[in-house]
Amino acid sequence: MIDSKQKIAVLGAGSWGTALAALVARHDYPTILWGRDVRVIQSIDIQHQNFRYLPSIMLPQTLRATTDLAAAVSGADWILVAVPSYAFTETLCRLAPLLSIGVGVAWATKGFEPGSGRFLHEVAREILGGDVPLAVVTGPSFAKEVTLGLPTAVTVHGEDVCFTQMVANAMHGPMFRAYTGNDVIGAELGGAMKNVLAVAIGVADGMQLGMNARAGLITRGLNEMLRLSAVIGARPETLMGLAGLGDLVLTCTGDLSRNRRLGFALGRGQSLSDAIREIGQVIESVQTSDEVMRQAEQNGVELPISEAVRAVLREEITPYAGMKALLAREQKPEYLDILFKANCSL
């Protein structure tokens, strides 16, 4: 039974924040959505539509929206942050002095902190302190499909079991499954890397390289996820689940994926600036490719697909040159090490 006093504040009125706010509002949780754009907030609060990011989709009439951050978080039982990665640090800095004791913070932001390459849970812990319950929401989920009520499955990872379950319970419903776990690093890694890898698949599709190439890039991209996860302390099963493989497949094959659309445009010969302008929304891979490679270089892990994507997004090489370089790599064993080690205690 839902606690009638429980209130959820969602920070970020883009497509994903709006979708998640609408989801929990439909599950009868008192929900308020915060955003910066006055016109967007007014359209949500008055017309019950996000005219900019989710046009023509009706939102629950019980969903409230505001541009006042203090008003949004006042009395909230927990907070869900759904802003782009470049705004994550600033948003938490503004939130910290407004946060009441015992209020947990979850986020559906994917990526790393731009510039430092830090995982977002590291940023959150530093800004919010050690006593605030934290959790990350991730998995294969297009905002439009969630808002339309189409079947979706995500996973919520956090060290605080009670808070993690609270977040999952609010989201879980007839058309939305929310699983739980405690591998925050793995969950964040999958959500960040899939955006970079989706650009490579988009490029291949734009160049009309065929379904074989797409399948090969997705599989070898998953291998890159697993190899990096092995050296940073993430669990391979997390990357083989919704947070990794699930999100990777959706982002690499779905036409709603902005990162795939960016790669597709580049593969068709469009310039980076024109492609970004045409898509018209934040494309996480543009910054995340730098941070993924920063993690790889710091840990001595070779990520050829991610490295090629970074070079293309920096406009150091053409998409054609990037694909040619990947195909010209020397022959080698498919696996250089055991990715999954048997647990004899099971």
UniProtKB/Swiss-Prot annotation:
Q: Where in the cell is it found?
A: Cytoplasm
Name the InterPro entries for this protein. 6-PGluconate_DH-like_C_sf (IPR008927), 6PGD_dom2 (IPR013328), G3P_DH_NAD-dep (IPR006168), G3P_DH_NAD-dep_C (IPR006109), G3P_DH_NAD-dep_N (IPR011128), NAD(P)-bd_dom_sf (IPR036291)
Source domain of life is Bacteria
Task: State which pathway it belongs to.
Answer: Membrane lipid metabolism; glycerophospholipid metabolism
> What does the UniProt record say this protein does?
Catalyzes the reduction of the glycolytic intermediate dihydroxyacetone phosphate (DHAP) to sn-glycerol 3-phosphate (G3P), the key precursor for phospholipid synthesis.
Asked if Magnesium is a keyword of the record, the answer is no
Gene name, Swiss-Prot/TrEMBL: gpsA
Positions annotated to bind sn-glycerol 3-phosphate:
K110, G139, S141, K194, D247, S257, R258, N259
GO CC terms in record:
cytosol
Main subcellular location: cytoplasm
Catalytic residues (UniProt): K194 (proton acceptor)
The record ties this protein, via SUPFAM superfamilies, to: 6-phosphogluconate dehydrogenase C-terminal domain-like, NAD(P)-binding Rossmann-fold domains
Q: Which family does it belong to?
A: Belongs to the NAD-dependent glycerol-3-phosphate dehydrogenase family.
Under the heading HAMAP family, the entry gives: NAD_Glyc3P_dehydrog
Q: Which GO terms describe its molecular function?
A: glycerol-3-phosphate dehydrogenase [NAD(P)+] activity; NAD binding
Any GO BP? glycerol-3-phosphate catabolic process
Residues binding NADPH, per UniProt: S15, W16, R36, K110, A143, R258, V282, E284
Q: Which UniProt keywords are given for this protein, alphabetically ordered?
A: Cytoplasm, Lipid biosynthesis, Lipid metabolism, NAD, NADP, Nucleotide-binding, Oxidoreductase, Phospholipid biosynthesis, Phospholipid metabolism
User: Which residues constitute the signal peptide according to the record?
Assistant: none
Catalysis: reaction(s): sn-glycerol 3-phosphate + NAD(+) = dihydroxyacetone phosphate + NADH + H(+); sn-glycerol 3-phosphate + NADP(+) = dihydroxyacetone phosphate + NADPH + H(+)
Q: What is this protein called?
A: Glycerol-3-phosphate dehydrogenase [NAD(P)+]
Q: Entry's Pfam families?
A: NAD_Gly3P_dh_C (PF07479), NAD_Gly3P_dh_N (PF01210)
Please give the PROSITE patterns that the UniProt record associates with this protein: NAD_G3PDH
Q: What is its EC number?
A: 1.1.1.94
